[in-house]
Amino acid sequence: MRILIKISSVICLLIITNTVYSKTIQIDFTPYETYSIEVAHIDVGETIEWLPNADHNVEFLGGPNMNYLPEKSEFNEFYSVNFDTPGVYLYHCTPHGNMGMLGLVIVGNNFNNLKDIEEIKLSPVAKSVLQKLIKISKSNL
């Protein structure tokens, strides 16, 4: 019986510890039409928060499950996404995406859907920025 209680206690402690140590990253918008963090490496279950800005928002263009992407944020509204599925997520600012205002989220260091992300139709400027962000994402491993 004591062993069962000890095992249950350890399991509860592990669950609580995992919840407590989940990380949240905050991303702001810069005056240069970029996100303050353009490539975010996070673990499964972690959260990213985008701080409010009157001129910018967040719209996901691709992810590991193209049928289920986070909803587009409103302008000047706090926006938060918890990432439970590993893979590469591409997002942009709706009015400034064609000018290269993009960001990548790499969840669980999983690049399995990178080819799908690279095939998303973008303006030439945005495509160039995406290639730069992909290089950065791979160099941060």
Where do the protein language model's features map onto the residues?
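Extracytoplasmic copper-binding redox domains, predominantly the cupredoxin/blue-copper superfamily
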Residues: 20-141
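Sec-dependent signal peptide recognition
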Residues: 2-10
